[in-house]
């Protein structure tokens, strides 16, 4: 009550929508051709088989981590949700080749803000797969996760998950 009266503190929403960060074909997590992701060892989520080489922010929050090899970005929402956007499979071995990171750790982002551009053809030819996992890495802190089974998805526009944090 005092927070509302005196304007101190920020009301944090427990519910958050996760939008697809890539345009392409929705892939169920169980169908990602990598057991670390398919068996949910890193957390719950989904994959996208991209049709273009731009990643946008799937949530409003901040950039928590930009991997030195440019193939993945960690994001954190105000409500504590942590999200990993991993471009392709076994792309760490490319050592940043074919990727252009557009943000830095600590940057505030909104849904649809560009994060990374990548050369889709290069990754298709040099990595295990272009299928890109999007993973909630702190699934244990979520009260509920509802994943929508989509087909074709559009970056920054198609909502794919609703999460309620504890």
UniProtKB/Swiss-Prot annotation:
It is found in: Cytoplasm. InterPro entries: Dup_hybrid_motif (IPR011055), PTS_EIIA_1_perm (IPR001127), PTS_EIIA_component (IPR050890). GO terms for biological process: phosphoenolpyruvate-dependent sugar phosphotransferase system. One of its GO terms (molecular function) is metal ion binding. Transmembrane segments: none annotated. It holds the Pfam family PTS_EIIA_1. Gene3D superfamilies: Glucose Permease (Domain IIA). It comes from the Bacteria. SUPFAM superfamilies: Duplicated hybrid motif. The active site is at residue 86. Keywords: Cytoplasm, Kinase, Metal-binding, Phosphoprotein, Phosphotransferase system, Sugar transport, Transferase, Transport, Zinc. Disulfide bonds: none annotated. Zn(2+) binds at residues 71, 86. Signal peptide: none annotated. The record marks 71 as: Important for phospho-donor activity. Its main location: cytoplasm. The modification Phosphohistidine is found at residue 86. Residues 34-138 form the PTS EIIA type-1 domain. Its cofactor is Zn(2+). One of its GO terms (cellular component) is cytoplasm. Binds 1 zinc ion per glycerol kinase EIIA-Glc dimer. The zinc ion is important for dimerization. Heterodimer with glycerol kinase (glpk). The EIIA domain is phosphorylated by phospho-HPr on a histidyl residue. Then, it transfers the phosphoryl group to the EIIB domain. The phosphoenolpyruvate-dependent sugar phosphotransferase system (sugar PTS), a major carbohydrate active transport system, catalyzes the phosphorylation of incoming sugar substrates concomitantly with their translocation across the cell membrane. The enzyme II complex composed of PtsG and Crr is involved in glucose transport. This is PTS system glucose-specific EIIA component. It comes from Staphylococcus aureus (strain MSSA476).
């Amino acid at each position: 009550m005092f927070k509302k009266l005196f304007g101190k503190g920020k009301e944090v929403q427990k519910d958050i929508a996760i939008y697809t960060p890539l345009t392409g074909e929705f892939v169920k997590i169980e169908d990602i051709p990598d057991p670390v992701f398919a068996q949910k060892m890193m957390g719950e989520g989904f994959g996208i088989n991209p049709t273009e080489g731009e990643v946008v922010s799937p949530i409003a929050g901040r950039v928590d981590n930009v991997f030195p090899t440019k193939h993945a970005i960690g994001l954190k929402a105000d409500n504590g949700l942590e999200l990993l956007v991993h471009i392709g499979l076994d792309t760490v071995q490319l050592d940043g080749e074919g990727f252009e990171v557009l943000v830095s750790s600590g940057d505030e982002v909104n849904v649809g803000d560009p994060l990374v551009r990548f050369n889709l053809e290069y990754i298709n030819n040099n990595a295990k797969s272009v299928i890109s996992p999007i993973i909630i890495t702190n699934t244990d802190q979520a009260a509920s996760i509802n994943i929508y089974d989509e087909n074709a998805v559009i970056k920054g526009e198609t909502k794919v998950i609703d999460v309620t944090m504890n």
